[in-house]
């Protein structure tokens, strides 16, 4: 907020930071739109799940969390006809990754529709390179404007198949704010992108 020049922008940033503090104290989400529950699960290769299905257990946990936490239920059954709300915001979208070790790690992303609707994907020619990725990211952020719920955290996935690139973009937003990619070259690109995204003037 110290670098924001607009008085209105400064006030909005102050209110956003107050909202962050309140959400942290009350253990509530930043935004009322808790949309689709996206769950990323790292399963250690030495972990043995007994007594039932891991996916069923996750969905029961999501349902209990959304119900007991008074979070908005947005998922409907039979979307082409009756559109009956499931009341539990399930089924969740569950991604499972096998990793070394004997631990289970679960990350929950309550992905609101406002920001999800701004997601973009593009297959580029290899010649587009780093510059092409940069242009695509900047164009996407600029065209999205104020539609995604603030604070806007941009996740970028590069490489692999179409669905894997989108998965990587979603996974990127699970990092702590300010935490960079472990690869130095990628981390430097992130810093460059962040500076250029902030220079667009989108936001307060």
Language-model regions: role of each:
Residues 1-204:
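Non-transmembrane, aqueous-exposed alpha-helical and coiled segments at domain scale
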């Amino acid at each position: 907020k110290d670098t924001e020049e607009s008085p209105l922008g400064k006030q909005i940033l102050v209110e956003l930071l107050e909202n962050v503090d309140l959400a942290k104290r009350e253990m509530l989400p930043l935004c009322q739109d808790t949309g689709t529950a996206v769950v990323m699960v790292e399963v250690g290769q030495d972990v043995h799940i007994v007594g039932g299905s891991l996916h069923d257990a996750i969905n029961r946990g999501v349902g209990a969390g959304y119900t007991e936490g008074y979070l908005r239920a947005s998922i409907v059954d039979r979307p082409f006809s009756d559109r009956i709300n499931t009341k539990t915001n399930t089924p969740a979208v569950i991604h499972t990754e096998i990793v070394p070790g004997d631990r289970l790690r679960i990350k929950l992303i309550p992905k609101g529709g406002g920001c999800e609707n701004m997601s973009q994907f593009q297959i580029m020619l290899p010649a587009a390179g780093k510059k092409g990725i940069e242009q695509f990211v900047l164009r996407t952020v600029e065209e999205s404007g104020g539609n995604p719920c603030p604070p806007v955290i941009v996740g970028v996935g590069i490489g692999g198949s179409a669905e894997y690139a989108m998965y990587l973009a979603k996974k990127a937003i699970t990092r702590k704010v300010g935490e960079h990619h472990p690869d130095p070259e990628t981390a430097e690109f992130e810093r460059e992108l962040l500076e250029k995204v902030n220079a667009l003037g989108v936001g307060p």
